[in-house]
């Protein structure tokens, strides 16, 4: 079938619009290699895809604000974070952990752990989680270094998608 206007009984039918909800997506990145201290957020320096008013971010900050702008009881977002991680030169070789944090609290269900064999040995991590924001409220989400030492983060990518 055609998805355009056609004559039906002498009337013109307007074109069909297919909404795939991709207008509610935002992507924030940091292509540089940055040192992130233990317990701190990964800074996001570029906005690859700007979101609508329900996703708010300030360039260079590590925090993204999700707003519950909805007519339903809650707005649901899918939040994902990926990066390459390594222990910097001079650090102790041990497990590296990073997690998504909601309002500053790391999520155990969205924690990535890798154990490198040596310093400067990069591994790729990716975590994702669904976040529900009550109508009229706001939550902050971030990617946090939950390791016990400073970690290098390279090519960080933070994606927020409004799913309902």
PLM-predicted stretches and their roles:
Residues 1-24:
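Short, Lys/Arg-enriched N-terminal segments with co-localized hydrophobic residues
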């Amino acid at each position: 079938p055609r998805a355009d206007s056609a004559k039906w009984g002498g009337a013109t039918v307007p074109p069909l619009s297919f909404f795939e909800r991709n207008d509610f997506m935002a992507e924030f990145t940091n292509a540089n290699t940055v040192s992130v201290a233990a317990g701190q957020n990964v800074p996001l320096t570029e906005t690859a895809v700007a979101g609508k008013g329900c996703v708010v971010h300030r360039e260079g900050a590590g925090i993204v604000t999700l707003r519950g702008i909805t007519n339903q009881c809650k707005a649901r977002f899918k939040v994902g974070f990926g990066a390459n991680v390594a222990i910097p030169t001079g650090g102790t070789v041990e497990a590296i952990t990073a997690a998504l944090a909601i309002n500053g609290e790391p999520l155990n269900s969205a924690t990535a752990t890798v154990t490198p064999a040596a310093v400067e040995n990069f591994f790729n991590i990716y975590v994702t989680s669904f976040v529900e924001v009550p109508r009229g409220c706001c939550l902050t989400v971030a990617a946090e270094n939950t390791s016990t030492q400073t970690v290098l983060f390279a090519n960080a990518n933070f994606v927020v998608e409004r799913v309902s």
